[in-house]
Amino acid sequence: GLFTPKTVGGVRSMRDGEHYTAVDSGRIVRYSYRTGERLAVIFDRATATPSIDFTDYRFSADETRILLSTDVKPVYRRSFTAEYWIFDTKDGSLRRLSTGGPQQQAAFSPDGHRVAFVRDNDLFVADLADGAERRITSDGRKNHIINGIPDWVYEEEFAFARAFEWSPDGRRIAWLRFDESRVR
């Protein structure tokens, strides 16, 4: 309409403040803010092994790793499950975050060495150095206990889809636990 805002979609600022990334034909490309020039392809699904069709991405704080989401399936308005992959920009390796089933709300630790995520209403942490996966909660159960993600009402009314956060030093995780066991 007449008063609809125009936006630039898919642009991600890099931490140096001089560059940004955007997706172009299955590639994550770095550009210069100053010139708009395309400077480098950071990730290319066509040359990645295995080749994956990602729908979204996030950098670790130091921008050496990229969390890529694939096979995205909606849950509610803002939430979804996905298969996440980790791309290491230093050595070009690409590996699946977890093989235990679809995950929700994967998030890098502040140092970029671990990723927390929710699966089947339980919170997990994957160590990226050795691939070890640690289950943080074990009482998650559909329509009873939800750890690390909000229930439908909180997601819908308060517009958030992740209910956990890393501490600034990355040593701890705080999360919300929703008990729906008495909801009829």
Name the predicted role of every residue range.
Residues 1-184:
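Beta-propeller folds
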